[in-house]
Every structure is written in C-alpha cells, then in structure tokens.
Amino acid sequence: MVDISTSLLCVKKEKILDTVYKLEDAKTDYFHIDVMDGEFVKNDTHDLMLEYCEYLDNITKIPLDIHLMVKDVKNYVDSYLIFNPNIITFHYEACKKEEIMDMIKYIKEKGRRVGISIKPETDVKEILEFLPYVHVVLVMTVEPGKGGQELIPSTISKIEELNKYREEHNLDYEIEADGGIKVENSEQIIDAGADILVAGTAIIGSKDYADTIRKLR
C-alpha cells in the first residue's frame, strides 16, 4: 500500500500541535517538511520548519520526510539532521553535478535515507546515473515553492518513466510524488508507480483526516 506523507506547510503555527495529534490518529506515514530558503524558491520557510521539527521531535514518533528546496544543501542538511529524519531529499537542480554524489554519500553516512528531487521541467535522464545510490526519487508534480497548486499532468509520465527504469534495472528506490495531489487524482499517480504521496491541502483542508488519507491510498 502507498505511504502518505502529510505536508505541514499549510498548517498555521497556532494549530500545529492539535493538527499533529489529529494526523497521528489518522495514521499518516510521514510528516513532510517543506524547507525553502527564499533563493532556490521565492518563499522562505526555514525558521518555521525548524520550529515545527522541534515540536515534532518532542511529541511524535512518526518519521520526518525532509524536502530541501534550497541552494546551500549541505548547510541545511546539517540543520535538520539533529531531528533524526527518516528521509532527507535535496534537489538535483540545486547542486553542481559533480557535487551530487558527495551529498548522497554524506547523508547516507549520517544514517539517513537520501532522496533526490526534480522539478517538473527536468528530464528524468538527467538523474539516471544517481538512481542506484538513492533511496527515494521525489518528482515535483507542481512548481516548487508553495502549496495549493494544481497538479501538472505531464509530470505523471516522469513517474511512469522512473517506475519502468526501476523495474528494468532491478533497483529499489521509492518514487515520491509531491504537489497538487488529491483524492480525485491519487489513483492515477499510484497506477503510474508512485510509492509515497505528499499531500497537504487535500488533507489539512478536509473535515476528516483519516477518511481523506484512506481515500488517497
């Protein structure tokens, strides 16, 4: 069964604790932490996400899924390692190609699962050489930087391509889809080969978190 990683990006600070408890009861698999630096993308969420991680570190055992939408990847990786995340994902587009393997090795050496992410316009072929070494490939199904966007239909073919490549080369990375995911389109994304669905607005904006998570799966 597909895993659900609930994004906390759209949760207001004064509601974070109550929301976390409700999401625990609703059986979310991960808390998805969208870290933005104001450079790689326009929004800057770093301070708020650090604060959320501190809350989560004290009150929940649900694993953290850290998604770094930042230019200075190494610096931000170090900031979030203290929270013992399950997954740390960085963007292919944020690094020079010769730096990517070093970053993959660094995150692995810290005992974390490592993910590489691509924007909607990035060709899957750009990251093929790194796929044997990562645990997760995150496909942005919207433009990174803000929640509540509509899924870009053409990104589903990237999930299909990654799934086919995984099967043909006997690899075991998980495919994570992030952006514009809701009950109405989740089946199509799962059928394309996704293993983890990131959803924020679809869950947080619903009346019944557990029912929405169940329907997304």
Q: Where do the language-model regions lie?
A:
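Structural motif
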Residues: 26, 59, 83, 110, ...
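Conserved, mostly hydrophobic/aromatic
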Residues: 16, 23, 34, 80, ...
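Glycine/small-residue-rich loop that forms an oxyanion/phosphate-binding "nest" at active or ligand-binding sites
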Residues: 33, 45-103, 116
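Glycine-rich phosphate-binding active-site loops on the catalytic face of alpha/beta enzymes
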Residues: 8, 88-96, 138-149, 192-213
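Catalytic cores of alpha/beta
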Residues: 18-21, 72-82, 122-134, 179-197
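Glycine-rich, proline-tolerant flexible connector loops at the mouths of alpha/beta enzymes
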Residues: 31-50, 142-148
